[in-house]
Amino acid sequence: MKTTGRVNGIISNIVIVKADGPVGQNEICYVWTGDTKMMAEVIKVIGDAAYVQVFDSTRGLKIGDRVEFEGHMLEVTLAPGLLSRNYDGLQNDLEKMDGLFIARGSITDPVDYDAEWEFSPLAKAGDKVTAASWLGEVKEQWVMHKIMVPFTMTDSYTVKSVAEAGKYKITDTMAVLTDAEGRDHEVTMVQKWPVKQAVRCYTEKPRPSRIMETGVRPIDTFNPMAEGGTGFIQGPFGAGNTVLQHAISKQADADVIIMVACGERANEVVEIFKEFPELIDPHTGHTLMERTIIICNTSNMPVAAREASVYTGMTIGEYYRSMGLKVLVMADSTSRWAQALREMSNRLEELPGQDAFPMDLSAIISNFYSRAGLVKLVGGQTGSVTFLGTVSPAGGNLKEPVTESTKKAARCFYALSQGRADSKRYPAIDPLESYSKYLEYPEIREYLDEHIEKDWVDQVYAGKTIVQRGKEANDQINILGDDGVPVEYHERFWKSELIDFVILQQDAFDDIDANCPMERQQMMYKMVLGICNQEFAFADFEACSQFFKGLINLFRQMNYSEWKSEKFEGYRKQIEQYVSEQSK
C-alpha cells in the first residue's frame, strides 16, 4: 500500500509533508491542489516530516492538501522513439503540450506507445544473459536501437524464448528470461531507470584512448577532447558559449547528441528547435535532428526541474552508450544547475559554503562528471559518453565556486575570453588559459602519433610557446612603443598573430570554414608552424607587419576555400612563393 500524507508547511517550492508511513530519500510523490497533481521529490526526511521539492509553481497550495508517495525515485523511460524528441527536465514531451506556456501539472508520455517497430532478434533460446545484454534490435532513425535486458535485472539469466522478426509495439513481450531459481521474467522494449543513479552495466571503464573530432580548430588542434572525456566551456555572457556549443553539436563525430538546455534563454532553445531539423549531418547525410535529443528547461521554467534535466540527459546518454554508440552530452549551462542546488540548499537552511552554494558542491559536480566515460560492454563492444558543459559565472569570474569545482572534475577547460570576444576573435577560446589534460595521456599521444603525425603533441606545445612569446612581445611593444623594441619583437608578435588568425579563429557561419576536418587542420597547422620556425630579415617593423598582414590575408582566403580544390591549391602555391621571396 502506498504511503500518503498531508501538507504541513510551505516554503516557496519546498513543501513539508506529514507522512503516515515510510518515505525514502529522493522518492517521487504527487501533491494535489484541487484537480491538479504536481510532481515532487523528497529531499530530506526528519521523523514523520518529509521535505519535498515541487517541480511546479506552488501557488494556491494550502495546508492539509493531499500528497501521494510513489515508492520509487525520479525515473526516465528508456525505449525506442527517444531520438529527435524535445523534452522538459522531467521527460515530458514538449511537442504534445498545447499553449505558449506549460500548464501546471502537465504530464505527457515520453514515447509513443502505439507505434510499431521492426524487430530483429540477436539472442537465441539457451543464451546466458545479464543486465544490458542485447536481445534484439530495431531501427530508430538511422541508429540500430538495441533491445536490452533491463538494467534493474542484476542477476544471471537464461533466455527461454525471443520474439521472431516482425513488427511489435514497445509494450509487447520481446523475450522471456529464466533466473537461477526457475522463475520466468518477461522483457519488453521499455525499461525505467532512476536518473540519480549511474548505469554501471559494463565490465570495464578504461581510460580514453581516442580523440573526438569536433571540426573546431582551436579545440581539435590545440586542446583536443577525448572520446569518453569530460570538458567545460567557461566564459562571461556574450563571449560565444552557445554558438560554440551549437557548432560542436552540429559537427562532432558522435552517433547521438543530447543537448540539455538547463536554465537557458528561450530564444536560444528555439534556435535549436528551428535549425536542427533543417541542417544536414555531414557524417550521415541525414538531418541533425535525427540523431539529437533536446532536454529543455528555460529560465522561466521551475528552478527545481533544472536540477533534474541534467541528470535526465546523462541517464539517456548512458542508455545509448550501452548500445555501443558514441554519445555526446552537452549541458548549457551548469552554472544555472548549481544555482538550483543553491536555492534548494538555502531553503532547507543547510550550512552555506562559499557564495552560499552547498558545502558539498564539489562532490556533486565531480560525481556527475564521473558518469561520462568510455566503457567496455558485457558483450565485448565499446561505447562512450563524452560530456561537455558550460559555466557562465557572473562577470566572467574564474575564481567562483562552480568554476573551481568543475576544473577539478573536468579534464578539458575552454576559457572564453571577454577581450577576444570584444575584438571579434571567434571562437573566443583563450589559447593560454585553456588546456586539455588528455595531451598528457600516453594512450592519446600514441593515437595522435599514429593517426595524425609523429610527435604531434610536441608540435602543439611548440605552437603554444609561439603564442605565449608573442603575447610577451606585444606587452613590451605596448610599453616601449613600436620604435622602442628590436624588429625581432615585432616578428615574434606577428608569428603569434599568424597562428591566431589562421588556426585559432574560425567562422562558424561559413559553410566551409565552420567544419574543418582533422586532415585539413594537420596540413594547415604544419604549414603555419613551418613559417613560424623560419627566420626573416625585415628592414623595420612596418615591413614586418605588412608582410604578415599579406600572409594572413592569403591564409584566410585559403580557409574559405574548399579542401583540395583548385582555389585552395592556388592559394597554397601563392603562400609558398610569398614566403620564399621574404626568407633569408
Regions found by a protein language model. Give the residues of each.
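N-terminal accessory targeting/assembly segments
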Residues: 1-103
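Metallocofactor- and cofactor-centric catalytic cores in central/energy metabolism, strongly enriched
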Residues: 12, 38, 47-50, 72, ...
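Short alpha-helix capping/helix-loop boundary micro-motifs
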Residues: 14-18, 50-56, 113-124, 158-162, ...
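Conserved "cap/hinge" positions at secondary-structure junctions
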Residues: 19, 33, 70-71, 90, ...
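Short, compositionally biased
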Residues: 43-49, 80-91, 142-166, 184-199
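P-loop NTPase nucleotide-binding/switch module
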Residues: 97-152, 169-229, 244-247, 282-299, ...
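P-loop NTPase catalytic core
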Residues: 221-222, 228-551, 556, 564
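Long, highly charged low-complexity segments enriched in Glu/Asp and Lys/Arg with interspersed Ser/Thr
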Residues: 546-583
